Design a protein with these regions (language model features):
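N-terminal loops that bind phosphate or other acidic moieties
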Residues: 1-46, 50-191
């Protein structure tokens, strides 16, 4: 599954880019198609993303629900991450338990911090300085929610600043926590 083909920066015209309004839903939909085809190992190629949703869209496409303080569903976009109060996982596709997922990307990409995805890549995706900080706060909050919703997969990972967690707008963190995906460099996957 190639991130750039499903949610790539080049798919959004330069004057319309807004990483707070884009989603990785298409990536999750492609994972679902791979599951339908009987895949036992799925490799997500990361790079050139137009998103900053922490993988929220992909998880929603695979059956998760994002709920606000009133229990209403929240659209899985970067600007909404701070509004999410709970990730409901009971509807996650059960086939995910039997598949190996590899997220192949730049292991230097971190989810948050000075080298985090919103600060490093937000401006090239169209984010204003204010939006960069709002996305950063949303991603910090999102990592906490991921750890609560997926404690088994998240327990041994540093979702905020672990290597590769910022791959493709934070897709690395979302899939590592939500699917137990292994984060690795593209080079390692090819060899």
């Amino acid at each position: 599954v190639e991130m750039a083909a499903a949610a790539g920066l080049r798919l959004v015209p330069a004057g319309m880019r807004d990483p707070g309004a884009t989603t990785t839903t298409g990536v999750g939909e492609l994972i679902s198609v791979a599951l339908d085809g009987g895949a036992r190992r799925i490799i997500i190629g990361c790079g050139d993303s137009g998103t900053c949703d922490g993988g929220a869209g992909a998880l929603v496409a695979l059956g998760a629900r994002l709920l606000d303080a009133d229990g209403h569903e929240v659209d899985p976009i970067g600007s909404n991450l701070a509004r999410v109060r709970r990730i409901e996982t009971s509807g996650m596709d059960p086939r995910l338990r039997d598949v190996e997922v590899l997220v192949a990307g730049n292991m230097h990409n971190l989810l948050t911090g000075e080298r985090g995805v919103s600060r490093v890549f937000g401006p090239q995706k169209g984010a204003s300085p204010e939006q960069v900080e709002a996305l950063e706060a949303g991603l910090v909050h999102w990592a906490e929610l991921l750890a609560e919703a997926f404690p088994a997969q998240a327990a041994h990972r540093d979702l905020l600043t672990g290597p590769g967690t910022g791959a493709s707008g934070g897709l690395g963190a979302g899939l590592a926590a939500g699917l137990g995906a292994r984060l690795c460099s593209r080079f390692d996957v090819l060899m």
